[in-house]
Amino acid sequence: MRKTIKVTLIRSRIGRLPKHKATLDGLGLRRINRHVELNNTPAIRGMLNLVSYMIKVELLEEGNQCV
């Protein structure tokens, strides 16, 4: 069963390092309290690890898609 990850931006991008802002852009997170669903891959996990202090991560099963 393939898992997806629900990622929510909980802290502002203002005053962050340009590398962290670029990582958030790559993840598709542009506004606070917005979320995206991403595939659970090592590349995505590395990006999430870089900006872990700004986001909330939840694992979703294949049938549990968020609305």
From Swiss-Prot:
<keyword id="KW-0689">Ribosomal protein</keyword>
<dbReference type="GO" id="GO:0022625">
    <property type="term" value="C:cytosolic large ribosomal subunit"/>
</dbReference>
<dbReference type="InterPro" id="IPR016082">
    <property type="entry name" value="Ribosomal_uL30_ferredoxin-like"/>
</dbReference>
<dbReference type="Pfam" id="PF00327">
    <property type="entry name" value="Ribosomal_L30"/>
</dbReference>
<dbReference type="GO" id="GO:0003735">
    <property type="term" value="F:structural constituent of ribosome"/>
</dbReference>
<comment type="subunit">
    <text>Part of the 50S ribosomal subunit.</text>
</comment>
<dbReference type="InterPro" id="IPR036919">
    <property type="entry name" value="Ribo_uL30_ferredoxin-like_sf"/>
</dbReference>
<dbReference type="GO" id="GO:0006412">
    <property type="term" value="P:translation"/>
</dbReference>
<dbReference type="InterPro" id="IPR005996">
    <property type="entry name" value="Ribosomal_uL30_bac-type"/>
</dbReference>
<protein>
    <recommendedName>
        <fullName>Large ribosomal subunit protein uL30</fullName>
    </recommendedName>
</protein>
<comment type="similarity">
    <text>Belongs to the universal ribosomal protein uL30 family.</text>
</comment>
<keyword id="KW-0687">Ribonucleoprotein</keyword>
